[in-house]
Curated annotation (Swiss-Prot), chains A, B:
Protein origin, superkingdom: Bacteria
Annotated NCBIfam families: cinA_nterm, molyb_syn, PncC_domain
Designated name of the protein: CinA-like protein
Homology family: Belongs to the CinA family.
The organism of origin for this protein: Shewanella sp. (strain ANA-3)
Length: 425, 425
């Protein structure tokens, strides 16, 4: 099997001044082609570090994608380091020098002398074209590995990987790309509790399971490698969904908001939202998607009691008798938000996100949630003790979305989730 | 000099399914303490890869922070790999087993058997406490290096680095901690335009400048190393602020929302928000902070025209004559939101976030913003062409916050930002 590694260069990546999105993009693009990266090394702009890492990793990998350090400034030294690592000199690549001169002429600019450096490649390098920038790519064979040098500018990297790198490794290593992936989105279960349920299953050969925590969700990834495993993927997925029950809330979606958005978009159905403790989170996550205006009518973040009365028409006596965090209040909030524009659905939340504001009867993490429809209202009051303010809010939003999702599927709206408690009515 | 490296583990980080924000956070936190990372290696969940990287890097570094792989599932194998790398066995740490049992008892849950694994540490390991999770940290000496193992959950990592790791390296390597840092938050300028203004300044010895892009903000970090430089830091900061003018919107705050929250908290002043294109972002960013209920009365995300009329009292004729994205509409939205609860201030936004919905007259990126006060209303219509939907929304929220910030300082509410255009009224 071909061993692929990545070397990321640049002080700003190593020092955390920028998050390395190139690395994540490259790895997930390779995954989609069925190729796993074995290791990624990130180094700064020090010549001796670069030489050392090229020499060292070229003993272990078959292909190494090197990203960054091809620019015109003094801290761009990938080509020089590669030449030194191989013990050869830098020579001017005529073709690229011509390309640079043409590029600057086309852009009506004079070429700074510093850009000439970008045409200097290690003697044994094979040039790799970059039609979208001034940094020339190249590849060099050292020890076991092909080192493939790419620019740090994201769209130049992407272009070069798609147009040059992938065809190159396909050809060079005769790759078989048969891989499939299914993602299940879950809420209300810890990673270990999900694993305890899944790990006893006997999975067919070629099928592996991964977990990714992205609170309030945990995503389960089912990888299938090879045609036989891919054919079995739907059956395995069905089995896992059965075992996990209400924990699974979406397939191949990143969040419940995306699932709701997809279901409501162009459905002709409309939604209103009244939020207290979730503070705009439910609304905001939907507005993130273009086209949400087709179904989302308004989201009313009625943080104060006065606003619940004035904007949503909650009865002041309800607030007095039951408090803002109560089933009667949140039901009136949902009904009020729905009635203003006669929406098909309205979601409402009211709770104590913390860290302060809890009482013995209603501690921090108590959240009332309601869904109003044209025919009635569903509500529950959940318990999320010992969660951070942010997690109380994001879990509450997830439960609210799930109530609506289940209503849209005409399933029971209120269900138990393993790690989420509930007050009896 | 102490050589610090980082090893990130986890298939989901290596494969790019998640961007490695832990790595960026750790590196920039170390930078703030005056310590540079030399190299970062990212490996997946394969035992032999982990063993190889521990053995190899322990020959080169003095301290290696290892992140991830301490969970209860079968793909968490950092402790096992470390034990194998050192040729010793895993033994149960009684103290941590007790901690786990107490943790689950306190949370009224039965401990899954899989969690027992989290108490198994390499024989020579020194346990490192994790008061905020079930993953036990530890450190092991191998060859030249101390390998320091930390959980992958971001807030557990952060807690352990601050409370345990930094004191440990301080003590072990006798580090000189004389470093100070000032952060300036900016909006409306590109990084190169900020650098063009700052780089001509002659900075005293020991003072260096860093930039961090966290859209819609760019943060400028002014590091001072040594007592002399620290003493000069206020003067240098003042000079840079003068040179940058309206670009600087806060000091030592991560976002403008945090600056507004700090100013309004317990001020006795109240705020209402009416959002259209920003879709709850302004409200939601404030609700993120505990205590925001002391000033935030409500945030009305009036996405549809009907909602602007019914909830905010916008005149239908205004919408007909000028459209939803217009100065008159956004002014009525702000005045309406303020009037409902007689708030001191109200912010309103209405714009075209894209990718669709633009016209020749009002292209994607056109956003009207208003601030209503007890004495009047300020408004402007800005142009944000060629920005993503998300950036149009976050820049609009930032400009709205800045209008309120400037009003609270009794400065001119509407000012020019270099990279943000504006329609003339």
């Amino acid at each position: 099997m071909m061993k692929l590694e990545m070397i990321c260069t640049g002080e700003e990546v190593l020092s955390g001044q920028i998050v390395d999105t190139n690395a994540a993009w490259f790895a997930s693009t390779m995954m989609e082609h069925g190729i796993e990266i074995q290791r990624r090394v990130t180094v700064g702009d020090r010549l001796e570090d670069l030489i050392a890492v090229f020499q060292e990793r070229s003993l272990h990998a078959d292909v190494i994608l090197v990203n960054g350090g091809l620019g015109p400034t003094s801290d761009d030294m990938s080509a020089e380091a590669m030449a030194k690592a191989k013990g050869e000199s830098l020579v001017e690549n005529r073709e690229w020098r011509q390309h640079l001169e043409d590029w600057f002429t086309r852009n009506n600019r004079e070429m700074p002398v510093s850009n000439l450096k970008q045409a200097m490649l290690p003697e044994s390098a094979v040039m790799v074209d970059n039609p979208v920038g001034t940094a020339c790519g190249f590849r060099v064979k050292l020890n076991r590995a092909w080192l493939f040098f790419t620019p740090g500018v994201p769209f130049e990297l992407k272009h070069m990987v798609k147009e040059q790198f992938i065809p190159f490794i396909r050809e060079e290593f005769d790759l078989d790309a048969k891989v499939a992936l299914k993602k299940l989105l879950t809420i209300g279960h810890g990673e270990s509790s999900l694993a305890d349920k899944i790990e006893p299953l006997e999975l067919p050969e070629g099928i592996t399971i991964g977990y990714r925590s992205s609170m309030p969700h945990i995503e389960i990834k089912i990888f299938a490698r090879g045609e036989k495993a891919i054919a079995l993927l739907p059956r395995v997925t069905g089995h896992i969904k059965m075992v996990l029950g209400t924990a699974v809330v979406a397939e191949d979606k990143a969040t419940l908001a995306e699932e709701i958005h997809t279901k409501l978009l162009n459905s002709g159905l409309t939604l209103s939202v009244a939020e207290s403790c979730t503070g705009g989170m439910i609304t905001s996550q939907l507005v993130d998607f273009p086209g949400s205006s087709s179904y989302l009518q308004h989201g009313l973040v009625t943080y104060s009691n006065e606003s619940k009365v004035r904007v949503l028409g909650v009865n002041p006596a309800t607030l007095d008798d039951h408090g803002a965090v109560s089933i009667p209040t949140v039901e009136e909030m949902a009904k009020g938000a729905r009635a203003i524009l006669d929406s098909d659905f309205a979601l409402a939340t009211s709770g104590i996100a913390g860290p302060d504001g809890g009482t013995e009867e209603k501690p921090v993490g108590t959240v009332a949630i309601a869904l109003a429809t044209r025919s009635g209202v569903y509500s529950q009051m959940i318990k999320l003790p010992r969660r951070s303010r942010d997690l109380v809010r994001s879990l509450s939003a997830a439960v609210a979305y799930d109530m609506l999702r289940r209503e849209l599927l005409t399933e029971a709206v209120i269900v138990d989730y393993q790690s989420i408690g509930r007050f009896s009515k």
